[in-house]
Amino acid sequence: MIVITKFLESIVDFLEKNVKRIFSYPGEQILPLYNEIEGSSIKNIMVRDERGAGFMADGYARITNHVGVCLVTAGPGATNLTTPIATSYKDSSAVIAITGRCSRDKIGKNYFQEIDMSFLNFYKGYFVKEPNLKYFEEAFSLSFQNKKPVHLNIPKDVYGEFTIEEEINLNEMKDNNKDNSKDNDNKGNDIVDKTFNWKTLINENEKFKKTLILIGQGIYGTLSYKEMEKISSVLKKLDIPIATTFPARGIINEKEENCVGLIGRRGVIKPLLEADRIINVSSSLSFNTYPESIRKKLLSKTENIHLTPKNIDEIKEFFETFGLGEPWETEKWKRISPQGDYSTKINEIIENIPENSIIITDAGKHTVFTCLLKTCVVPRNIIASHSFGTMGFSVPVSIGAKFGTIDFGIDREVVSISGDGGFLMNVEELQVISEHNLKILMIVMKNNSLAEFCKIKNPNINRLADAFDIDNCYIENVDEIPQTIREYVKKDKPMLVVVETRDEKLPRPNI
């Protein structure tokens, strides 16, 4: 049966069935869609910069394990999305980026804001040249299944045409991911190709005395948030050591007896070297996980399972069927002890916020100290730009994560930790926090410098918070932190805390 409807209405109907909220900034080339969404059941959050829309969609996707959607106009609207979409690509986050375009007859004719838009196709992009929902169906499926950003570029005149819902050959603008699959030693975000058959692994169990399971964030698959929380109860029953990559921390409570914890440059190395077999479950094996100096040695004894479960029963079945060999003892990751003023204050923050808080760090010294000082007990205990290292990440991603907790009934505090450099990169999004009264604790570690690079001069950040009508305070002494956090937890509104710190050198990576 052929169904004919107006394409604009078809898009909004599709979005209403698949998303609860989008993050957007209006502009000429998307006005038809923007206005139609405003009149729909979809919650439309207007950001204050297009970068914010991309980052918020990213944060929403990471905490919910669902798709995050952003909508921006053509030209400068789309170019502003470059950094957040690159971040979601490198960090493997399911983001749909919808951008506007001038009418099809004006493309390539130097029209206002008209440029080639394929720069957003880090993973996949579709030029929606025809009024067909297949573009949307394919984009959402790809993004959700593969946890990557997908770009939908829609010319303005297509909205007014009528949809013919029949099979078409999708017109891909460009797939920039081809060069990312050259060899196993340099795969970037992609899973190593050499994937073993389960039966082969089972038959070989007796050959190995020291099997280590390494789990990456890919194991979240398409699970609901509630099912993500159940993975730890499956893993803690296993007898052999389990290690995690940085983004997968908390997938098993790091207090469990069989949890080795974080491995790699900022984790422990010894279990990787001692194991005679490593079962890699859904990790991309980045250079942070397998450092370059020992990478080839580790890859030679690694067997890969690309498990992308649809429900918790599939994870149970895998580990029950697999059987994993004998238990063995090895070194475990341990949180460091704070040494200087900076790490002592970070530690005091971590010790006083709820243990299951969603801590979202920016890029910088505070990120490393948070990683080294926090014991992760639940999935997404720490969210960071672990593969792209994006400054200006924390505040807008925290906003997206907070909206995700609201939409999906996730009862956890959201805590943003930034340096004074990164905080000022997206400070305009404080208006979104204020406007929606989002309960987010924002910590700014103020040391008036960009790591070891240079000194910087800051504005009065507390007065900035005042301008956005956000409660705030200034802390110099570490003893002030516990009471400040206790007061925040009691309230139902946002708070910004500026923590004056003295500089401190980072511990050296383990390798």
Which positions does each model-derived feature cover?
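Phosphate/pyrophosphate-binding active-site segments
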Residues: M1-K6, N153, E165-L170, N176-N177, ...
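N-terminal alpha/beta PP-like core and its mobile active-site loop of ThDP/TPP-dependent enzymes
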Residues: I2-T321, D411-E413, K439-M442
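Conserved thiamine diphosphate
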Residues: F112-K148, A275, S282, E326-S337, ...
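Active-site diphosphate/adenylate-binding microenvironment
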Residues: F7-D13, K17, Y25-E38, P327-T405
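Short amphipathic alpha-helices and their capping/turn segments at secondary-structure boundaries
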Residues: I85-T87, F140-S143, I349-N352, L430-E435, ...
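Thiamine diphosphate
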Residues: I98, K106-S118, L272, I312, ...
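Active-site nucleophile and cofactor-binding loops and adjacent substrate-binding regions
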Residues: Y25-G27, I45-F55, C70-P76, D362-A363, ...
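A general structural motif
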Residues: D49-E50, I107-Y111, G188-I202, G261, ...
